[in-house]
Amino acid sequence: MNRQLVQDIINAGNKAMNIVPVKYVIKTKDDKYYCYDGLYYDDNHVEFYDDYDDKISLYYEDIVGIRIGNR
């Protein structure tokens, strides 16, 4: 997925997290991850803890979809 688009979505969700509970859904070709604690990114990848408290690290090209919703 486009790196700038992913970063913009993460920024919006992390800002909203200060006001309302936020849930991220991150989709890859084979998996779907749920995150409730915010996502972190740099120029190469995105990191987060999923709903099983496993640390997940994904390259931008592995992400096929990302969305934000209320818990």
Where are these regions (language model features)?
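Structured surface patches comprising rigid loops and adjacent beta-strands/short helices at the edges
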Residues: 39, 58-71
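Acidic, low-complexity, intrinsically disordered interaction modules
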Residues: 16-59
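Short glycine-rich, low-complexity segments
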Residues: 1-29, 66-70
